[in-house]
Amino acid sequence: MGNSDHKSEGREVSFFRSFIPQKISNEKTLTFFELLRKMAFHNFPGNLEKNNANFKNHLKEIEENNGYIEEQHNYTDMYYGNKTISFCGCEIIATYNAIYDLTGKHDISFPEMINEFEKDGIVLSGFFGTAPRAIEDYLKNHGFKTISSSKKEEYDKIGEESDALILTLYNDKYDIFNMVHTINITKKDNKYYIHNNGYKSYLEPYYSITDILLRINDGEAKDIFLIGIIKN
């Protein structure tokens, strides 16, 4: 039973699958996440203990990646709500990476950060990850100055004014079933680098947030929300 009614560059596009990324505004998407955030269940006994025990399995890899978490798919032994970090932890990973980029330290442990988002930010017990605005609230609560927008035309200015960024996007602007992903963007010598978006994604330079959106996931991604973070 097909639901395709047009093509994009030779690709069949399903009206049903593309409806949310194509037709629903970013602000409405953020509002939906906020509603689910407020309705969230917050009691996940045992997760912090298991995560503290298992995080040591990843320390060598983090060291090899210059202090960043890059290989989310390896985190099948750490939990966020009722899911694993490998399934739904990208927002927390992006936050962890951004704070490390800004401070050069891991003062907040990754398991403790997961625990904090389980108390405020988790959506559908982890099935939908973390509400994007909860990331900004977390950063503010930990003393970071932020600027944010869901309007693409404002992104490059935010990129220029920020020291690190966190971008939430649809993996596929034509297929909501390919889910949402959140990445940390770091800056060096007026170039932008993305973290935790596939094998050694941090090695490829970009030249603006617009450039990232044009090229990431072969141009198939679509923005939802950008947070810029400014060093204290």
Located regions from the model:
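Active-site-adjacent structural segments surrounding the nucleophilic cysteine of cysteine proteases
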Residues: 1-124
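A glycine-rich, coil/turn loop motif that links secondary-structure elements
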Residues: 85, 125-129, 155
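A structural signal for well-ordered alpha-helical scaffolds and beta->alpha junctions
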Residues: 92, 128-132, 220
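Hydrophobic residues in alpha-helical segments
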Residues: 117, 156-159, 216
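Mid-length scaffold segments of soluble, non-membrane domains
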Residues: 119-148
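Active-site-adjacent substructure of cysteine-protease-like catalytic cores
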Residues: 148-192
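Noncatalytic regulatory segments and standalone regulatory/sensor domains
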Residues: 186-232
